[in-house]
Amino acid sequence: MEVVKMSLISRYTTPTHFFTLPFCTDGITELAIIYYQNDNVVLIKNLSDCTRNDTVISVSLTEEETALFKPQGDVKIQLRVGIGEKRMNSKVLRVTVYDVLKDGLLSEISGGDAP
């Protein structure tokens, strides 16, 4: 299974990741998108977290979820799908994590000048 498109991860943002598959996604019965960094599974998104459109699976991350990633070390991402009894995995993708100058949700830090 080949994943064609992937966006980057920046901490405290709300990215949407797109996975283009070589088949229609309608038949997918199980799905896990695993985000792995520094020898730990950081986040798993499931089928209920995703949107399907023809051959594309998309998943959005929240500010809280991207805050879980460390600014040091790439994140590895793998898509695993099940269609009935069949199981498939994508290649492991590596994306760079971009840091922020000030930690915190935007709504918490945008109230004026920070000390």
Labelled PLM ranges:
Residues 1-115:
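Contiguous segments within soluble domain cores/interaction surfaces
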